[in-house]
């Protein structure tokens, strides 16, 4: 007789992950900043306008502040959930993913900020978090996210 494995519990709430998914997807579809005074076209200047990070971006700042306010276990779960959604493991390997995420976080000089920077550096963060929740059998769109 085959026993079903219990689905692990997340330290971070569905509402918090849903909020981040929504914000990350908003961020992904934003218009890219353009330097109107550059005087060249994107092909000639190696598309540097596209590569520049606009640190004044309020959406990125909001996401960073929100993630920095999460506790250590919640941040670890976000990284592991992103990896799960990216296909770096399966739900059966959840504890291994969490352990790897904790080891990565503990290797940082400033774990809270560097974990946030790592997550924000993932171009498909919202999609991967949504897929990760889906692997848990959790829908992020059940209701409006209010963390």
Question: Can you describe what each PLM-predicted range is?
Answer:
Residues 2, 62, 138-141:
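Polar alpha-helical coiled-coil and adjacent low-complexity
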Residues 104-147:
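Helix-rich interaction surfaces within compact, conserved domain-sized segments
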Residues 2, 25, 110-112:
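Long, solvent-exposed non-transmembrane regions
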Residues 4-78, 83, 105:
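Aromatic-anchored, charged helix-turn/loop surface patch used as a conserved interaction hotspot
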Residues 16-19, 62, 93-96, 114-115, ...:
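Exposed alpha-helical structural elements
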Residues 35-36, 80, 93-95, 143-147:
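Short coil/turn segments at secondary-structure boundaries
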Residues 71-116:
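Amphipathic protein-protein interaction modules
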């Amino acid at each position: 007789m085959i026993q079903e494995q219990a689905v692990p519990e997340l330290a971070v709430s569905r509402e918090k992950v849903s909020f981040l998914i929504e914000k990350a997807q908003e961020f992904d579809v934003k218009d890219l900043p353009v330097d109107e005074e550059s005087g060249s076209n994107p092909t000639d200047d190696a598309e540097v306008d596209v590569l520049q990070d606009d640190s004044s971006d309020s959406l990125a700042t909001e996401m960073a502040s929100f993630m920095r306010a999460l506790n250590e276990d919640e941040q670890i779960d976000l990284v592991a959930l992103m990896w799960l959604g990216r296909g770096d493991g399966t739900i059966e390997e959840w504890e291994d993913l969490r352990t790897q995420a904790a080891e990565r976080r503990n290797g940082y000089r400033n774990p809270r900020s560097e974990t946030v920077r790592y997550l924000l550096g993932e171009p498909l963060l919202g999609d991967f978090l949504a897929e990760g929740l889906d692997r848990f059998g959790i829908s992020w769109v059940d209701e409006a996210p209010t963390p």
